[in-house]
Swiss-Prot record:
GO terms for molecular function: peptidyl-tRNA hydrolase activity; tRNA binding. TRNA binds at Y14, Y64, N66, N113. GO terms for biological process: protein quality control for misfolded or incompletely synthesized proteins; rescue of stalled ribosome. The record marks D92 as: Stabilizes the basic form of H active site to accept a proton. It is an enzyme of class 3 (hydrolase). The record marks N9 as: Discriminates between blocked and unblocked aminoacyl-tRNA. Monomer. Transmembrane segments: none annotated. The active site is at H19. This is Peptidyl-tRNA hydrolase.
Length: 198
């Protein structure tokens, strides 16, 4: 069993905001496998797929971003999952250009409140993640950065750019589950495989 959690905020008003990139990634993976993420479990919506013969639980916490750790830690306990080996978290990263992704084996949550909540709830930052770039593009970068930007619906052009990152995120998830985090880092953190240049 493997647990893949996408972070975001529930509610239609947040659906296509940069902060919901993790939810969008889980939805894209589920759609690709004709799965639905709708079962309520541990304060999250969940669904199941198979990757490389391994059962994968897809999850979207319903706790809102800042309390993501409540749902993630409950799922980890219920599924008897090891956060280092059996967990992968997908979330937005304001400091990466939109359309790019970074696969990390562990690390600081930096300023991401959802990642901070997970670190606090699990008692460790040693859990794999895919950070999905949502950094604003264009001349209004400085004006658009921050909380208001993260919670504002994306422009069509930015959504189109993000689609490429969601597709690469789905491939990265499959690689982590079937071949390991090290292989995924080598493959998806190379600039030529990672969307727009930083």
């Amino acid at each position: 069993m493997f647990l893949v959690v996408g972070l975001g905020n529930p509610g239609i008003e947040y659906q296509f905001t940069p902060h919901n990139a993790g939810f969008l990634a889980v939805d894209a993976i589920a759609a690709e496998h004709n799965a639905v993420v709708s079962n309520r479990r541990c304060q999250a919506l969940t669904g199941k797929i198979q990757l490389g013969g391994r059962e994968v639980i897809l999850a979207k916490p319903e706790t809102y971003m800042n309390l993501s750790g409540v749902a993630v830690s409950a799922l980890v306990r219920e599924l008897n999952a090891d956060p280092v080996r059996d967990l992968l978290v997908l979330y937005d990263e304001l400091d990466l250009p939109i359309g790019s992704i970074r696969v990390r084996e562990r690390g600081s949550p930096a300023s991401h409140n959802g990642a901070r909540s997970i670190c606090s709830a699990l008692g460790t930052a040693d859990w794999p993640r895919v950070r999905i770039g949502v950094g604003p593009s264009g001349e209004d970068d400085l004006f658009r950065k921050g909380k208001n930007y993260l919670l504002t619906p994306m422009r069509k052009a930015d959504l189109a750019t993000l689609d490429g990152a969601l597709e690469r995120t789905a491939r990265a998830v499959e690689t982590v589950v079937t071949r390991g985090i090290g292989v995924a880092m080598n493959e998806f953190n190379r600039r030529e495989n990672n969307g727009p240049a930083a």
